[in-house]
């Protein structure tokens, strides 16, 4: 029965992989629904405050670029050829060979430069034109040939085109997507978990599928009780920090990166790139030792992975074949950053890693080190790929102390036969015991390793684009991992007496994260167009039913903020009711959700206070608006599942109330100076609420632009 279950788990996993590979969106079992377009009001303020309303911030986000492109090509009344020009250049920059680049460069010149020159519409500098012409004449086509044009294209786009985009519905759609991203709270329900594919000291790794996009990932689940039992909290949090460091910004195809991290009451979960091809240790045992030509491939991709880490001041500290994972096409990524360390502010001293791969300075007590440790480990790993064992396990010794002693004291004697001169020189350079003499530590970092004669035939751009041919391609249609029975299970009795306290939860309060760039790429590759089409239909249908229109409130009135918000109301004020709120300097208007009736009005002088701290009311974080005596309710409670909107409403309400109070106090003092008493003689007794302030607000509200 166990064998049958294992087979069924493998079949289910492989089917999910195949469908995710061809049509990931078709595998989505959960639909994304974008927030209402009114969220633009909130998001525009939020983006302005965070400095993210600038052209570069939006243009360099995947979804921002796609929506700006959509506006330029399908909405803008004036032609916008810059986008296609930009995309052609980006395609050129990814070309592998000089011949490919030359063909593409000539195509770009003919279709985007010459055509505009003939039409006297080439609005770019003479220097950019001459630079391209000169290099094309020489048939010299470096990847950055059109870099000057890219800068000028961006300068043109950030002008009138970008300003018109910000006033369009496409920017509203960007606000909707960004709001969705920033409010994401993942749980286990957002993933379909498949078979186990690995196990570590604190937990297991599973194959999984993201429910709303159909994309396959690896889910690394760490058990909080097991972490507590082994006092591994620092290690778990460090892995989360290191993964976010290497996963943010420019993507690295040679590191197993993280897209999400979230937690359940008993688990810490990392959502990582899924690698289906097994690890180099496994393939070394199956394939046997590699030739130098085969080893060059793995060395080149691993070097680019290390370069990515070192550029972010991260030292990996655990480089070995078992941590180098293959994808289904045979390309590799460095995995498991549990021992990685940020050395930007303080260099580490700890002796951590795997015996036989640790550098002498790591083994030496109290010695500070940095990226130097990884270059030594690289030498050890490459030696093992060529010879089948670590250079410090000549006699297959398993005595850790003996291995460490050899690492600290023994000069490596490379065999005379079986190694080329360049390969021997590379390994000797990487395995130097003295850090200043070691290759990679002489002042130029990864560059001096890449420039070593052993890699003289390597085109590093080709390596980066993953177009170098792998020496080994894992078998398709197989799960390249041990079966669940062999991987085994943890003994639950080990953690039976471990109790999680409130203080344990506090340790992980900042654990959750969404890596923006990677989430946006996932959306763009899967469901972006489908969700946009569904949202367009739903919004059009909703607008047709609304009797009260709220179009472009920001421009047509002095509304401070508007959008959907929930108010505690109903019988016995026991239920949260959805309202459409509009905040003006003098009042708060709360419309029914359908926008089919007049609003409930709350004037600023009726408000005693907007509490500085939000409170938990009926399980929701709520804004508390205290009202003055005589009002039918002692307070108004407002909430929103959208955390950004809730904070912006809270800030705006407090600010509006404070400003109105200051204004009313000034008006009161003026009345005393003019009339000698604190009242307005223009009001009758029936109109006077007790001070001049209400009269002022009533008159002010009559001139506010309403609905």
From Swiss-Prot:
SUPFAM superfamilies in the cross-refs: PH domain-like, Protein kinase-like (PK-like), Regulator of G-protein signaling, RGS
Catalytic activity: [G-protein-coupled receptor] + ATP = [G-protein-coupled receptor]-phosphate + ADP + H(+)
Record keyword Metal-binding present: no
Protein's recorded name: G protein-coupled receptor kinase 2
GO molecular function: ATP binding; G protein-coupled receptor binding; G protein-coupled receptor kinase activity
Coiled-coil ranges (or none): none
Active site feature: 318
Entry's free-text remark on domains: The kinase domain is required for chemotaxis activity.
A Pfam family annotated for this UniProt entry: Pkinase
Domain PH: 558-658
Traits of the deletion mutant: Defective egg-laying with mutants retaining 35 eggs compared to 13-14 eggs in wild-type worms. Reduced serotonin levels, increased levels of the serotonin metabolite 5-hydroxyindoleacetic acid, increased levels of amine oxidase amx-2 in early adult stages and reduced levels of phosphorylated amx-2. Defective locomotion and reduced body length. Exhibits dwelling behavior with decreased exploration in the presence and absence of food. Exhibits severe swimming defects with reduced body bend frequency in both early- and late-stage swimming.
N-terminal signal peptide: none
A biological process term (GO) from this entry: hyperosmotic response
Annotated stretches, region: N-terminal: 1-190
Functional note: Specifically phosphorylates the activated forms of G protein-coupled receptors. Required in adult sensory neurons for chemotaxis. Plays a role in the ASH sensory neurons in the chemotaxis response to NaCl where it is likely to modulate the strength of the NaCl avoidance response which occurs at high NaCl concentrations. Required in the HSN motor neurons for normal egg laying by promoting phosphorylation of amine oxidase amx-2 which inhibits amx-2 activity, preventing metabolism of serotonin. Acts in head acetylcholine neurons to positively regulate locomotion.
SMART domains: PH (SM00233), RGS (SM00315), S_TK_X (SM00133), S_TKc (SM00220)
């Amino acid at each position: 029965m166990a064998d049958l279950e294992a087979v069924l788990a493998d079949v289910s996993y492989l089917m999910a992989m195949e469908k995710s590979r061809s049509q990931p969106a078709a595998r989505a079992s959960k639909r994304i629904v974008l927030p209402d377009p009114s969220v633009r009001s909130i998001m525009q303020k939020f983006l302005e405050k965070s400095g993210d309303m600038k052209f570069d911030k939006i243009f360099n986000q995947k979804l921002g670029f796609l929506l700006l492109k959509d506006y330029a090509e399908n909405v803008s009344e004036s032609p916008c050829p810059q986008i296609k020009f930009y995309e052609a250049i980006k395609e050129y920059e990814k070309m592998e060979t000089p011949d490919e680049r030359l063909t593409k460069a000539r195509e770009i010149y003919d279709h985007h430069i010459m055509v505009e020159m003939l039409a006297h519409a080439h609005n770019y500098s003479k220097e950019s034109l001459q630079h391209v012409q000169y290099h094309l004449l020489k048939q010299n086509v470096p990847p950055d040939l059109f870099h000057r044009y890219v800068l000028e294209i961006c300068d043109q786009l950030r002008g009138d085109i970008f300003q018109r985009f910000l006033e369009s519905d496409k920017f509203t759609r960007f606000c909707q997507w960004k709001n969705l991203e920033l409010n994401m709270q993942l749980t286990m329900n957002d993933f379909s978990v498949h078979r186990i594919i690995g196990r570590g000291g604190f937990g297991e790794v599973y194959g999984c599928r993201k429910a709303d996009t159909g994309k396959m990932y690896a889910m690394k689940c760490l058990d909080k009780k097991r972490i507590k039992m082994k006092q591994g909290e620092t290690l778990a949090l460090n892995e989360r920090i290191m993964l976010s460091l290497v996963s943010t910004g420019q993507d690295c195809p040679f590191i197993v990166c993280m897209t999400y991290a979230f937690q359940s009451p008993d688990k810490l979960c990392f959502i990582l790139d899924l690698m289906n091809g097994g690890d180099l240790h496994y393939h070394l045992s199956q394939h046997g030792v590699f030739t130098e030509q085969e080893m060059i491939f793995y060395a080149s991709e691993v070097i680019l992975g290390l370069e990515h880490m070192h550029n972010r001041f991260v030292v990996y500290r655990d480089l070995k074949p078992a941590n180098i994972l293959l994808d289904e096409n045979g390309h590799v990524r460095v995995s498991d950053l549990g021992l990685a360390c940020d050395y930007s502010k303080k260099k580490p001293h700890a002796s951590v890693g795997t015996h036989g791969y640790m550098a002498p300075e790591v083994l030496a007590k109290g010695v500070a080190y940095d990226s130097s440790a990884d270059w030594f480990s690289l030498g050890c790993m490459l030696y093992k790929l060529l010879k089948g064992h670590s250079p410090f396990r000549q006699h297959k010794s398993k005595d850790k102390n003996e291995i460490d002693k050899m690492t600290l004291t023994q000069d490596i004697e490379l065999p005379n036969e079986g190694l080329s001169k360049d390969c021997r020189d590379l390994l000797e350079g990487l395995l130097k015991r003295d850090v200043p003499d070691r290759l990679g530590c002489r002042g130029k970092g990864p560059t001096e390793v890449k420039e070593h004669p052993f890699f003289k035939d390597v085109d590093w751009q080709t390596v980066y684009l993953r177009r170098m041919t792998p020496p080994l391609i894992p078998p398709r249609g197989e799960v390249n991992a041990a079966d669940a029975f062999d991987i085994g299970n943890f003994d639950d009795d080990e953690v039976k007496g471990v109790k999680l306290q409130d203080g344990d939860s506090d340790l992980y309060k900042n654990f959750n994260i969404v890596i923006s760039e990677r989430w946006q790429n996932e959306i763009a590759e899967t469901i972006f167009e489908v969700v946009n089409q569904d949202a367009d239909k739903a919004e059009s249908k909703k607008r047709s039913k609304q009797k009260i229109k709220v179009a472009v409130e920001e421009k047509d009135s002095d509304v401070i903020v508007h959008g959907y918000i929930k108010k505690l109301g109903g019988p016995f004020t026991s239920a949260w009711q959805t309202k459409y709120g509009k905040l003006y300097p003098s009042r708060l208007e709360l419309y029914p959700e359908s926008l089919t009736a007049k609003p409930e009005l709350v004037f600023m002088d009726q408000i005693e206070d907007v509490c500085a701290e939000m409170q938990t009311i009926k399980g929701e974080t709520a804004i508390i608006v205290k009202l003055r005596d005589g009002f039918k309710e002692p307070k108004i409670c407002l909430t929103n599942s959208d955390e950004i909107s809730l904070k912006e409403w809270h800030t705006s309400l407090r600010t509006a109330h404070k400003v109105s109070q200051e204004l009313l106090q000034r008006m009161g003092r003026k009345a005393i100076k003019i009339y000698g008493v604190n009242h307005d003689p223009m009001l009758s007794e029936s109109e006077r609420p007790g001070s001049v302030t209400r009269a002022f607000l009533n008159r002010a509200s009559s001139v506010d632009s309403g609905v």
